[in-house]
Amino acid sequence: MSAPEMSKSKPANSHLSTGLDEAKLRAQVIEQSTREPSPTRAQLAVRHRVVLSIVMLVPLLIFIACGGIRVGPRPDGLVLQTALGSGILAAGLAILGVGRGRSMLGRPRSWLLLQVLLTPALLLGWRVLISACYPQMMVEWTDRPGLRCFTLSVILACAPLLGLLWLRRGSDPLYPRLTAAALGAAVGAGAWVLVDLWCPVGYVPHLLLGHVLPLLLLIATSALLGSRVIAVGRGSAPLTGR
């Protein structure tokens, strides 16, 4: 009878040991949290503004280094209309894609999906619509197929995209891929505005290769990174503050 009694006592000892380990771990976590207090929401807001300012300044400096605004053969009215229209669209899409709205869980899934789908369509449609109103503004440039615009679009978007993903790391419990895709669309829209000011070509195949394709790649890349970076439990989750 002693052998069975000994075998029955082993699970009890095992559960007791596990419980002690969990209690010890919990005590260590509580002790560490009290020793290293989390920053306040105001402090977090300041940090976020600093990071955003830096990552937004980088593409502007690159844009200036690459020549800045190049009117070229375009009429001033065309440049002004395309820049204003795409700028307003990019700002609205950024508010929709980057902002969380009233819910701490972020935008509804339908809003994010709509923003991702509409971003390339609206920006391309506006550029083509305005260019078509001016003669000779949609002709082919044989020496400008769109590769330089493609490269510039990607370079301009890198720093803002990485910065936004870092700020939103470990924060989305519902749709991390779609949220990240919306961030990529918002960043790509901002890069589109700068490239529009830099590029005088309105030829549709050029726009598809040099302007639309990098935007689509940014959206796809962001979606792939979403599950690894901004999903809850991935990476280092941002502190909520006090």
Where are these regions (language model features)?
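Membrane-proximal helix-loop-helix units in multi-pass membrane proteins
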Residues: 124-178
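Hydrophobic cores of alpha-helical transmembrane segments in multi-pass inner/ER membrane proteins
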Residues: 86-99, 154-163, 215-228
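Selected alpha-helical membrane-embedding segments in polytopic membrane proteins
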Residues: 42-140
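Disordered, charged N-terminal biogenesis/targeting segments of membrane/secreted proteins
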Residues: 1-44
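Hydrophobic alpha-helical membrane segments
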Residues: 156-159, 178-196
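Short, highly charged, low-complexity non-transmembrane loops/tails of multi-pass membrane proteins
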Residues: 233-242
